[in-house]
Amino acid sequence: MSKIQLVAEAKLPTEFGIFRIVGFEFPDTQKEHVALVMGDINDDKPVLARIHSECLTGDALHSLKCDCGFQLATALRQISEAGRGVLIYHREEGRGIGLINKIRAYALQDQGLDTIEANLALGFAADERNFSVCADIFALLGVKQVRLLTNNPNKIETMKKSGINIVERVPLNVGENRYNTEYLDTKAKKMGHFIVHNNEQHLIACPHCQEEIPKK
C-alpha cells in the first residue's frame, strides 16, 4: 500500500486557466510532489494527463538544452483546451540525479559526452526516476483511465503495471532547436523514446535558434 499522502490543496490561476493544485508528500523520503487538476476527472471518461519530471533549467530558466519547458507549457495548454485533465509535477530533477549532478552532467556534455554517457560517468544509471509514485497520485485523485501526454515508453509501462489504464499515448514533440537535437536523438536511439525530430514543424523560433539543425 502506498504511503504517499494528499496534504494540501488550493486554487491556482495560471496563464492557461484556473487549476486546482494538490500537494502530496511521501513520508519515507520527505519528497513533495504536486498535481495540477482541471475540471471533473472522476467520471468514466479517459483523462488527458501528463507526468512531468521536474526540470528547473527548462521549466523556470527557459534552457534550450532540453525540451522540458516546452513540453510543460504545451501539456498545460492542451489540458486547458480539453477543459479537464491532470499534470503531475514529479519531483525527480535531472532524471533523478538532482540539480547539482545535472549541472555536472551538463559539463561533461560540453566535453562531448551525450546525456546517457554523462550520467554513467557520474556513477548513475541512465534514468534514476521512479514513476510508480505517479500511479499512486492518479489513484488518490480517482483517475483510472488516462490519455497520457508522453514520448517515454517507461512511463506507460510503469502506469500499466501499477493498475492505471493507459488508453492512448498522446505525442508531445515540441521545443526542438539546434541546442537539443543531439539530446533528443540520444533519447530516441538509446532510451527508446517516441521522438519525431529533424522535422520543421517541431522547430522553435528564437533569436539563438536560426541555424539549421545539422543532418545526422
From Swiss-Prot:
What this protein needs as a cofactor is: Zn(2+)
Q: Does the keyword Hydrolase apply?
A: yes
Detail which positions bind GTP: R50, I51, H52, S53, E54, Q71, E93, G94, R95, T115, T150, K155
GO CC annotations, alphabetized: cytosol
The free-text cofactor remark is:
Binds 1 zinc ion per subunit.
Single GO MF annotation = GTP cyclohydrolase II activity
Look up the EC number in the record and give it. Answer: 3.5.4.25
GO terms in the biological process aspect are:
riboflavin biosynthetic process
**Which residues of the sequence carry a binding annotation for Zn(2+)?**
C55, C66, C68
Q: Which InterPro entries match?
A: GTP_cyclohydro_II (IPR032677), RibA (IPR000926), RibA-like_sf (IPR036144)
- Which residues are the active-site ones? D127 (proton acceptor), R129 (nucleophile)
Reported function: Catalyzes the conversion of GTP to 2,5-diamino-6-ribosylamino-4(3H)-pyrimidinone 5'-phosphate (DARP), formate and pyrophosphate.
Question: What's the protein name?
Answer: GTP cyclohydrolase-2
Name of the gene this protein is made from: ribA
